[in-house]
Each structure stands twice: as structure tokens, then as C-alpha cells.
Amino acid sequence: GSMQASLFDKDALVSTQNLPLGVLRLRELIAHEKLTQQGAQNLIAELIDNELVTYRKMYLKDREVKNLIAIGEPILTLYYKMDEGRRSEQITIQDFNRFYEHLKGMTLAQTEDFFDVNEEYASLLFPAAAMYKRMLEITGAEVIWVPGIHMTDGMAAEYAEDKKLIRFHHSFENDIIVTSRNMAKRYKCHMPHIQNVEEAALKVFDSLKKYHGLGQRERLLLQI
């Protein structure tokens, strides 16, 4: 299992990092080491710190992160119990920490009963909660937003856009371009030269469009 961390700044995608820290992997490590809850918490913190240290230095050092948007089944399960009766999509760090302390004191059997899930799924919930807790601490975020969407929602939205059934106001192509430029800065590329080459290449592409017959996707690939 793995986790993807994406950083947005004012609607623009800054970077995306895939981290080998999914809850399945964390659960296996905890079970293999036969750790206590406190030991498991320390191990998870160490693993997340190890994976995020470079990412944090490069992308978070000059940024103030206020919101963490969490997507996935484990956070939804935790959220439904934390949000009972409130009908809010956000969880404050104070509420999350209180709930985490409550969860940390539960046995596996108590976790099963509390969330009304089977043993296999119940064993994922503490590692998931510990992972989100550490992410809050590392980023300094004050609120977790839980929109309640799944991967299938994204697939359905992509299909609907391809079939012209819906139209997004957000530009995903611009996300790709911004991320590419941030990567170029990361590797100390000469930005004025890159911008001049990009501008010239796109002008040639656009002026010869009736001859080459290529579309918007090919133009995006050239721009990248």
C-alpha cells in the first residue's frame, strides 16, 4: 500500500509525492514487530518523518498549511464516528486529537464493536489514525476536510468530461504545467531559457496545426 500527498497553493497544484506508507503496510510492520500502541505510534511517526523529510524541506518550509484534505476509506470510517450528528465536512485538530486518544485506548475487539466492522478492517483504523495525526503535526494544518469521495467518483467525473457531459472550472492541464515548472526549479533549470523555448515551440505548433493534425493533448505534451 502507498499514500499520495499533493500540495495545492491557491487552487494550483504545486507537487505530488507518492509515499510507500499505506495503512496496509503500516499494519503489517506493527504486527510483525508485535508492538504496543505507543510503540506503534512511535514507529509510524518515524516512518512518516523519514519519507517526508525531503518533501517537507523542499515544499513546506516557506508555506503555511492550514487545511489537510483526506480521501480514503479509513478516514471516512473514522470521520463518520467523529461527526455523528454534526453534518460537517471538517474535523478540527482538537477534535481529531481527542478522538485519537479514545481510539488509542481501545483493544482490537473494542474497535470492532465501536465501528461495527470486522477484525481485518478494524486492525487498519489505528494505523490510519496515527498516520493522519502525524501528517497534521508535520504540516501544521488546523483542519482536516473529508469530502467523502472515492476513486470511482474520479473515474466517473473523467468519463463525464470526456463525453462532454460536464465541464470543470478547474484546469487540470494547468496543474500539470505548474508541477512541471516546479520540478524544473527543483533541478535548477534555467527558467528564462525554458520559457523562451516553450513560447517558440507552441507558436510553431499552433501555426502548423492544419498540417500536422495534432490535438490539445499533443500540445500539452510538447509544452511539458
Model-derived features: positions:
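Helical "lid/coupling" subdomains associated with nucleotide-phosphate turnover
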Residues: L7-D9, S15-I224
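Active-site-adjacent helix-turn-beta-strand microarchitecture at beta-sheet edges
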Residues: G1-S2
